[in-house]
UniProtKB/Swiss-Prot annotation:
Top-level taxonomy: Eukaryota, Metazoa, Chordata, Craniata, Vertebrata
Family named by the database record: Belongs to the phospholipase A2 family.
Induction note: Up-regulated upon M2 macrophage polarization in response to IL4, CSF1 or IL10.
Encoding gene, per UniProt annotation: PLA2G5
Protein name (record): Phospholipase A2 group V
GO cellular component: early phagosome; extracellular region; Golgi apparatus; phagolysosome; plasma membrane; recycling endosome
Organism: Homo sapiens
Pathway where it operates: Lipid metabolism; phospholipid metabolism; Lipid metabolism; leukotriene B4 biosynthesis; Lipid metabolism; leukotriene C4 biosynthesis
Length: 138
């Protein structure tokens, strides 16, 4: 057990940090879920992708609903969710947000919660909602 701490420290320090932001959410989704972010989640249900309205269609869509609300809370606090950058590490299936200013850390935390939620809901992912027309959301 004693030897694991130095090993863990070495590995944590040797994994390169990845630049974040809205564009890198794609990378985080793909690393954690193994799915193409744009084609699988860019237009999924009523909340995945831009905007959102109505009742989420399933667990995956609820993940996006929660993510939208997480982003909304950050915008209320003055964070620019579309261009704000942050750093995170990804190793052995684990996303770790790097320390930094409030907006950076919390934006990363919103994205981290989303990708783990999407991963938990992979089994219930429904291709029927992959390109769901928002007009049907109420």
């Amino acid at each position: 057990m004693k030897g694991l701490l130095p090993l863990a420290w070495f590995l944590a320090c040797s994994v390169p940090a990845v630049q974040g932001g809205l564009l890198d959410l794609k990378s985080m989704i793909e690393k954690v879920t193994g799915k193409n972010a744009l084609t699988n989640y860019g237009f999924y249900g009523c909340y995945c992708g831009w905007g959102g309205r109505g009742t989420p269609k399933d667990g995956t869509d609820w993940c996006c609903w929660a993510h939208d609300h997480c982003y909304g809370r950050l915008e209320e606090k003055g964070c620019n969710i579309r261009t704000q950058s942050y750093k995170y590490r990804f190793a052995w299936g684990v996303v770790t947000c790097e320390p930094g200013p409030f907006c950076h850390v919390n934006l990363c935390a919103c994205d981290r919660k989303l990708v783990y939620c999407l991963k938990r809901n992979l089994r219930s992912y429904n291709p029927q909602y992959q390109y769901f027309p928002n007009i049907l959301c109420s």
